[in-house]
């Protein structure tokens, strides 16, 4: 994840978030303090003001990624410019087991998050802009509507005629119309932001990548072009991870973790690239043959994942060029404005 190191921050605040409340845990003058506040902006700001009055000015919140429930705390901390880290729940689960903690309550979870922050000193998350949060939310809504549309179409197979059939068909068409409207809204938001628009146009230049795939990458992978190839592959969940221990040292690596919906979005452009992109096609054939050829079960799937990784690395490389070009352009503009404003020329 794109992040900044912040080990100099002294007070870590563990925040366990639920629908209506936030349980908080932090150390103040060597004493562990536990409290609970409402999950709304006013209560969060009040808590931060009170804790700062105790001279606890260096704050670093530790919270798990809990979807929409964490949105209020996320945006409030971002607007107040207070550092925080969104931790993968898998990491905190493993940390709890390593500490021998088997009980699970909101209070204990907040204490574990605070303990995790002090011991692991995680990097601070660089918060997304409002436009990026909106894009992700819109795309996740699109995924939900596609799933619902598929379910309605499956129901239509069991109703061949009559009122039930007509209602089901109307529902499927209505959902399809909403999906089209969502696609238009996503396109407008991408085009409204210069960086996203240039990234989108650069992706369309790559053989095999279409409008839907480019939109998905921008919505679900805002880190594109800011990380190296290995990091971006792991983030997408297409990097081979070794599982070797004891006598199992000869077992092959497998993909694990990553962003599931992003992998799904990469599948179709990769299939297209395997046909139309000569570099990806040659890579697919090479990997498949190395795994035993077309007649060996699973060889094609392994080759396809390898091609997804290669395609994503290429997209990441092109996105990095776009970002570097934008930075140079901004730097040149800034230099020109400074030169014009200078009295000594």
Residue positions per predicted region:
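Nucleic-acid-processing active sites and adjacent nucleic-acid-binding tracks
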Residues: 30-60
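Short, glycine/acidic-enriched loop or turn micro-motifs at the edges of active sites
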Residues: 19, 67, 91
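Low-complexity, acidic/Ser/Thr- and charged residue-rich accessory regions of DNA metabolism proteins
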Residues: 247, 284-345
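Acidic, metal-coordinating catalytic cores used for nucleic-acid/nucleotide bond scission
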Residues: 62-73
């Amino acid at each position: 994840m794109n992040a900044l190191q912040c080990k100099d921050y002294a007070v870590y605040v563990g925040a366990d978030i639920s629908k209506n409340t936030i349980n908080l845990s932090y150390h103040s003058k060597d004493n562990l303090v536990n409290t609970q506040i409402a999950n709304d902006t006013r209560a969060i700001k009040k808590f931060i003001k009170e804790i700062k009055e105790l001279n606890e000015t260096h704050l670093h919140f530790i919270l798990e990624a809990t979807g929409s429930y964490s949105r209020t705390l996320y945006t409030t901390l971002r607007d107040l410019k207070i550092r925080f880290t969104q931790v993968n729940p898998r990491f905190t689960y493993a940390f709890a087991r390593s500490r021998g903690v088997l009980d699970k309550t909101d209070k204990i979870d907040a204490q574990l998050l605070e303990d995790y922050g002090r011991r692991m000193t995680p990097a601070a998350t660089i918060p997304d802009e409002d436009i990026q949060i909106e894009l992700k939310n819109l795309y996740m809504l699109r995924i939900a509507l596609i799933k619902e549309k598929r379910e309605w179409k499956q129901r239509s197979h069991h109703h061949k005629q009559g009122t039930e059939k007509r209602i089901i068909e109307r529902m499927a068409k209505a959902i399809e119309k909403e999906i089209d409207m969502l696609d238009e809204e996503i396109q407008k938001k991408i085009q409204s932001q210069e960086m996203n628009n240039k990234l989108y146009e650069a992706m369309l230049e790559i053989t095999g990548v279409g409008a839907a795939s480019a939109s998905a990458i921008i919505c679900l992978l805002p880190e594109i072009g800011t990380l190296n190839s290995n990091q971006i592959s792991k983030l997408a969940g297409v990097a081979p991870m070794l599982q070797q221990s004891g006598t199992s040292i000869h077992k092959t690596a497998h993909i694990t973790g990553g962003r599931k919906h992003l992998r799904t979005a990469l599948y179709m452009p990769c299939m297209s690239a395997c046909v139309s992109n000569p570099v990806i096609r040659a890579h697919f054939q090479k990997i498949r043959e190395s795994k035993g050829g077309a007649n060996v079960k699973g060889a094609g799937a392994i080759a396809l994942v390898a091609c997804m990784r290669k395609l994503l690395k290429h997209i990441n490389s092109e996105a990095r060029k776009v970002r570097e070009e934008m930075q140079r352009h901004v730097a040149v503009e800034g230099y020109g404005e400074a030169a014009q404003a200078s009295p000594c020329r």
